[in-house]
């Protein structure tokens, strides 16, 4: 409808320009938005305010021309076109247009709100936790965020790949191996020296014990170098497997697990490594120089505040050099847009990476989202330690306590650029105070209504709700009964629910464009509220067959859209609660 109204407004102004009523060189960009106050109508535009000055007209005079033209063009589709304030134009759609959304939803089903195929290939890289220990709750937030953004972009028409960058090269892996080695020696009763900056979590001892149980004490008498080289691979595999299991338990599965080691590995027949090739690309484009024995990237040429080291004076590569190579590889794989989701501690890294991508020939094709941290609360108190382990609360601890649905939903309720206060007690409540329960309960309630309408017991597990819904037929004459009594509680509740269903495609479009899954959670809660209002004021199963079918169809459309919204968040839509 936004596109229809935009085209209509443009055509009205062009017609007025052609006959001399409006003097403009070109039609300004037309903006059509949902009013914040539903009483102002279904859509609004400020085009008269935008175009009045270049047209040399008073805004309300121009608004009058546009409004009159819209009334003529929209005809019976518009209930009212009104001028408000200094020159805003509010548009209220006819009930028939609103009621049409029910048929559209029930026809398109899970494709409702989906965009056309864009042909754009998008990679979303997220979580990318070091494989040296369990994930913290911040990783959980970024997992929910990245996966939901991927789902929303795919629904909007993009081809999306999810990728996890495994930081399995570098000194942290050596420290990790030395830590496991020390705990292994401790378990065998041998003398050991724990690394000063080693990893001290109980999970290190757990990994060492797994190795001891599987392979015995044969590594106790090996050289430290041999033991640590072996343990590095064993411990790495154990942690990586654990990360995959925890993420899968939250419904997050990656298409690619990209190993940093591959960037350091030489190519076939001793060919250059990916890092060397990445640096060579920058060098051939004239963006590399030497200073003080080191090799530098001239990132100041792309807006960075200082140049960045690629190769240190001792010949070793910086982490930045590996990141340059990694991003070069991403674009070599044909992605049109790369979205990286990083923790707040990487904020200062953004500009240098954007500079490198531009220097590689892909300006504007990298988008970095900074995910803020999560603060856990229980009974109003900050939670820092796990009751089970006495150590930091991990992402897995939280999942075990509140479940995947609640964790995902709560992680996504707030804008990414804001720290998140996660109330554990609230996430576990089975009441309307818990937003995810509130939304899921609305879906389950609709399923119960549909089962009851089919004459089945609401607890009958054998009833296929989709099959029941498919037998509900509501022709245009029946749907025209919805909202037929505006100004009454029932009529207003029906209209409110219809309007909310009609908003979903635009909500998805905005969430995809802005990378804002929290707009989907807000919408889901509003839709659930609109349905609960409808259910309170409208008896669904009534004697009048036409009205009954119309209201059942409206309930079914609400079920479909609630499930669709929850699906974009990676949250289940239960049929019973």
Residue ranges: model-predicted function:
Residues 1-99, 106-110, 114-577:
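Non-catalytic interaction-recognition regions
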């Amino acid at each position: 409808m936004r596109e229809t109204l935009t085209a209509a407004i443009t055509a009205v102004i062009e017609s007025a320009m052609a006959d001399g009523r409006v003097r403009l060189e070109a039609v300004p960009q037309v903006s059509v938005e949902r009013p914040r106050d539903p009483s102002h109508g279904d859509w609004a535009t400020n085009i008269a305010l935008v175009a009045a000055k270049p047209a040399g007209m008073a805004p309300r005079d121009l608004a009058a021309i546009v409004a009159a033209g819209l009334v003529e063009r929209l005809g019976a589709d518009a209930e009212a076109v009104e001028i408000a304030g200094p020159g805003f134009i509010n548009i209220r759609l006819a009930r028939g247009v609103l009621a049409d959304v029910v048929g559209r939803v029930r026809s398109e089903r899970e494709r409702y709100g989906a965009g056309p195929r864009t042909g754009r290939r998008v990679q979303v890289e997220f979580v990318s936790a070091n494989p040296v220990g369990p994930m913290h709750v911040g990783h959980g937030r970024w997992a929910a965020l990245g996966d939901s953004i991927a789902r929303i972009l795919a629904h909007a028409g993009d081809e999306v790949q999810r990728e996890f960058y495994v930081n399995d090269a570098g000194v942290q892996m050596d420290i990790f191996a030395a830590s496991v080695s020390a705990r292994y020696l401790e378990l065998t009763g041998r003398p050991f020296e724990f690394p000063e900056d080693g990893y001290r979590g109980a999970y290190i001892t757990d990994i060492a014990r797994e190795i001891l149980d599987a392979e015995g004490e044969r590594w106790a008498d090996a050289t430290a170098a041999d033991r640590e080289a072996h343990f590095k691979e064993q411990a790495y595999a154990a942690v990586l497997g654990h990360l995959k299991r925890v993420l899968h338990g939250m419904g997050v599965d990656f298409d690619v697990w990209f190993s940093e080691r591959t960037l350091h590995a030489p190519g076939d027949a001793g060919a250059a490594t990916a890092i060397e090739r990445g640096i060579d690309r920058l060098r051939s484009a004239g963006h590399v120089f030497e200073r003080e024995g080191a090799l530098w990237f001239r990132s100041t040429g792309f807006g960075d505040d200082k140049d960045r080291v690629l190769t240190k004076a001792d010949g070793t590569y910086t982490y930045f050099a590996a990141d340059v190579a990694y991003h070069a590889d991403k674009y070599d794989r044909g992605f049109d847009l790369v979205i990286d989701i990083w923790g707040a501690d990487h904020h200062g890294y953004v500009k240098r990476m954007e500079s490198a991508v531009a220097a590689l020939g892909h300006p504007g094709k990298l988008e970095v989202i900074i995910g803020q941290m999560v603060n856990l609360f229980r009974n109003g108190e900050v939670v820092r330690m796990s009751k089970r382990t006495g150590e930091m609360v991990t992402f897995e601890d939280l999942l075990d306590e509140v479940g995947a649905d609640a964790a995902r939903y709560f992680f996504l309720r707030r804008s990414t650029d804001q720290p998140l206060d996660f109330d554990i007690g609230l996430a576990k409540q089975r009441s309307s105070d818990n937003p995810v329960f509130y939304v899921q309960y609305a879906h389950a309630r609709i399923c119960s209504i549909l089962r009851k309408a089919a004459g089945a017991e609401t607890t009958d597990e054998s009833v296929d709700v989709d099959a029941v819904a498919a037998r509900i037929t509501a022709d245009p004459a029946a749907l025209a009964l919805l909202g037929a009594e505006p100004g009454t509680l029932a009529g207003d509740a029906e209209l409110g629910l219809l309007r909310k269903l009609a908003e979903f495609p635009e909500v998805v479009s905005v969430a995809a464009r802005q990378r804002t899954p929290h707009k989907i959670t807000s919408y889901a809660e509003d839709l659930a509220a609109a349905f609960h209002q409808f259910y309170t004021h409208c008896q669904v199963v009534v004697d009048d067959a036409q009205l009954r079918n119309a209201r059942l169809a409206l309930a079914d459309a609400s079920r479909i859209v609630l499930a669709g919204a929850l699906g974009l968040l990676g949250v289940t839509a239960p049929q019973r609660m």
